Amino acid sequence: MFQIMLGCDLEERKYILEGTKNAKLAAWWDRAIDIIPKEGGKGTAIEQVLAHYKFSKEESIAFGDGENDMDMLLSVGKGIAMGNAAEKVKEIAADICESVTDDGIYYYLKSQKLINE
């Protein structure tokens, strides 16, 4: 099994992993979490893709808005929080772009001259 998605409140989270040792929580909303392998997650996946294609961390960029994106944002050269991101995500991000609904990724990439019109 790769992951389980679960709806719960903040108080219930502390009971979910009782008795487990090989899983961790990745919260992506205040009432929703993923249960994933302890050694897994978006950050681990990014690191493996970078290694496979022989890219350095500095050559990579990622965008995220949920707590489940935090390890991914820290695993790249430049982690960008979306404008609608949770405060915890914004605090660890290298930069913040506009929100998802305002096409934040497009306008950020355009402003950095990473894409053309």
Q: Where are these predicted regions, by residue range?
A:
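Conserved acidic, metal-coordinating active-site core of Asp-based
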Residues: 1-63, 67-72, 84
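Residues within well-formed alpha-helices
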Residues: 59-61, 78, 92
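Hydrophobic/aromatic beta-strand patches that form the interior of the parallel beta-sheet core
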Residues: 61-63, 80, 97
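Active-site regions of enzymes building and remodeling cell-envelope glycoconjugates
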Residues: 19-25, 77, 93-97
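Asp-based, Mg2+/Mn2+-dependent phosphohydrolase catalytic module
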Residues: 75, 83-117
